[in-house]
Regions:
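Short, charged helix-capping/linker segments at alpha-helix termini
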Residues: 11-15, 29-38, 48-67, 164, ...
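Short, aromatic/basic-enriched loop-to-helix "N-cap" motif that marks the start
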Residues: 75-91, 164, 169
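Short, Lys/Arg-enriched C-terminal cap helix and immediately downstream tail that follows
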Residues: 80, 102, 135-138, 175-187
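Helix-turn-helix DNA-binding module
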Residues: 133, 137-138, 149-166, 180
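Short, basic/polar amphipathic helix motif occurring as a linker/hinge flanking DNA-binding modules
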Residues: 90, 100-123
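Hydrophobic-face residues of short alpha-helical interaction/recognition segments
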Residues: 47, 51, 76, 89, ...
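Sigma70-family region 2
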Residues: 29-30, 56-58, 67-85, 103-106
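A short pre-motif secondary-structure segment
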Residues: 142-146
């Protein structure tokens, strides 16, 4: 069964509500599509936000989230339960985003469009986006999860599989780098 047909099957099934994460996980392992719908309802918006801030546009973010749920569907039996299912989905989503960003960078290296000056009202956002692209991807992810998603360092550490202290240090470094990049003089 192809990924598209698996997702189409999931979209057509009736939805059910599962009271606990354990029940939901058991239903997902039985491939009950209503369980995957509940996973999407519970975590889809957060994953879309993370993906959007990682890849930079809605279409790619939607592709990354779709890929996330497809990988979760295929790999649910490998989920050990060492973390919350939402944490596991975030990890899959971040990896899907990184894969997509790498793919887009390779495509962009082949074709370079002409630069167009940003509209005045978009200048600050464009400067921030450019600065975010220039910092280390790991620090950028910590910054986005903390500043945009409002996650705690303990959640970030679990998702990124790093110590909590590393999350705090990377956030500090990301803020310092962004401040430097946004205030540096351009020739």
């Amino acid at each position: 069964m192809t990924g598209a047909s698996q997702l189409a099957l999931m979209e057509r099934s009736p939805s059910a509500d599962y009271a606990s994460e354990a029940e939901l996980l058991a239903a997902c392992r039985r491939r009950e599509t209503g369980a995957f719908e509940q996973l999407f309802r519970a975590h889809g918006a957060r994953l879309k936000s993370i993906a959007y801030h990682t890849v930079g546009n809605r279409q790619d973010a939607e592709d990354a989230v779709q890929d996330t749920f497809l990988k979760a569907y295929r790999g649910i039996d490998g989920f050990t339960g060492a973390s919350a299912i939402g944490t596991w989905l975030c990890r899959i989503c971040i990896n899907a985003c990184y894969d997509l960003v790498r793919k887009r960078q390779l495509e962009a290296e082949r074709v370079q469009p002409p630069d167009q000056p940003p509209a005045p009202q978009l200048a600050l956002r464009a400067a921030l986006d450019q600065a975010l692209k220039r910092i280390d991807p790991r620090r950028r992810m910590v910054f986005l999860l903390f500043a945009v998603e409002g996650m705690k360092h303990s959640e970030i550490a679990s998702i990124l599989e790093i110590p909590e202290g590393t999350s705090k240090a990377w956030l500090f470094e990301a803020k310092r780098e962004l401040q430097h990049l946004l205030t540096e003089k351009r020739p």
